[in-house]
Amino acid sequence: MKQQKPKISFIAAMLIVIGSSIGAGIFFKSSTVLENSQASLVLAIFNWLVASVAVIAMALALIEIASVRNDNLSIISWVKVFNRRWLYHGCKNFMTYLYLPLTFFFMPLYFICSIQDGFRGLLGLETGAHFNTSVDWLIWLALALIITTYFLTIPPLYAKVGNIQNMVVSAVKFIPLVFVPIIGFIVAGTGNGELKNVKALVQPPQINGATASFTQLVQAGYGITRFTGIGAGMGSFISIAAIFFAYDGFYVTAGLQSEMREPKKTPWALFLGLLITTLFYLILAVALSINGGLFSGMEESMGKLFNNKRAGQIVFGVVNLMIGIGVLGIINGFALWAPRFVEDLLAQGDLPFWKQVQGRLNPNKPVVGVIYCLVLSLTVQVLFTVIGALAYLPTVADYKNYVNTEIDKLNSMQWLYSFSDLMATWTSLFTFAFIACAIFGAIVNRKTKKITIANPKRYFLPAAWIAVVVNCISVFVTIIEPFINLFLLFGYDETVAHTVLGNDFIELNELVIGRVMLIVVLVFFAIISFLPVYVEDQYHKRKFGSLANYQQYVQQHLAHSTING
């Protein structure tokens, strides 16, 4: 039988890179980057450039790393090959028990948030569209569960449907990416935007029109990123970590080399694809930044531009619906992969119930993987929605318009959206931390040569070091920030905070809970990722005498299942 030739051309590969790395993430992170850059347009652009260089460097480094294994495990596989066993199991636990279900927790919520904005514009409402009940969160939960169930069943089991959905979404999601920069520059250029609130350079923080002192900022309860000097520096690296979220998914393309007609051109396809994505992001980031950082802030500005408030609302609504469709594209892409990586882990004996499903696994129709994903995702989705809507106190002011506070006294949707942001923050950070671990392990392997690299790349080491250094500093700064901010609350003065913040005043207990929760979730993620490794090892040592004996038992069982299958 003739061996099938790889079919992906250079242009097609470049388009795959662009399609997998560009998406709706920028609309959710642009304002965060501007805020952490202390409203400095120059610093915000610089942060986007540094993050983009780091992402391109990661992609180039991953070409060599991905060439070692050909499976559906992606990051998990790379960590397994180039790092220690405990780190592999930590990565596996994170991707299975946290990344997978939490993606189906907060991504449907981001879609719902976008359609609330969309219908707000289309219907001419003053606040986000809601059902005007005290249990709106339950109604939205029902929709979120339908989204998760659909995307975790139809696309994985009927790949053709998933591919068609990808094409449709790709066509739709590029419309906002082109339209928003154009309208953003026009709005700002005609004096209808928020350009006056954005400065070229970092400005010293102001309190009542005067430059604030360190003591005043501490007393008012500000976080470290609002401080002059060190605040801007830390804010830059936190911004870079946030920007990584906008590129999430680019690493899937690192395995393209084996599918290309001309494998030697893979680096150029990755480089040019990510470069085009970066240009899109930079232009869009500038357009959003000069209008306050959020597209939602442009609704009134577009009304002024068109000299028709209703026209501005309708355009705002249509674009937000398209952004929501872009979010569904992210869900669709992840849903195509998730059941397959779960089945690969089951096939290796690395997930619970692996013995019971041997002989039933099928990468083309991953029914077992689908069931596994549904049980995990739907359980977490319901549990975390209840916690977020009813028990999470700290709130993000931007979400106050997504619930009728006169009917829903708990502000449940504001709480829920704020809680989903908290989950998304650490989920993205852990993902890129594990990528950095895999790349660093590959750097070490260049010296030890424990893993044979068939085709070493000359550009690997410089790209790998850039990726690791930028990634590690960003992760480290993002981790220590909530600890510093919590410590700063010892200097909080309620009287000063009231005077400085006015209507934006936040109670001390809410500040404490918000900053403590960031740390609690970080610790929770670490425990869920790494504690099971220790517990399982102790159990297997006790039952089988040693880990080596257990691994031998697994291999014998898998071999027996293969023979019988």
Swiss-Prot record:
GO cellular component terms, A-Z: plasma membrane
Keyword Ribonucleoprotein tagged: no
Record membrane topology: Multi-pass membrane protein
Subcellular localization: Cell membrane
Keyword Nucleotide-binding included in the entry's annotation: no
Coiled-coil segments: none
Main location: membrane
Entry superkingdom: Bacteria
Ranges that cross the membrane: 8-28, 43-63, 95-115, 137-157, 167-187, 227-247, 268-288, 314-334, 367-387, 424-444, 460-480, 482-502, 516-536
Molecular-function GO terms, alphabetical: L-amino acid transmembrane transporter activity
InterPro entries given in the database record: AA/rel_permease1, AminoAcid_Transporter
Keywords, alphabetical: Cell membrane, Membrane, Transmembrane, Transmembrane helix
Family membership noted in the UniProt record: To M.pneumoniae MPN_095 and MPN_096.
Entries under PANTHER family matching the protein: AMINO ACID TRANSPORTER (PTHR11785), SOBREMESA, ISOFORM B (PTHR11785:SF512)
Name of the featured protein: Uncharacterized protein MPN_308
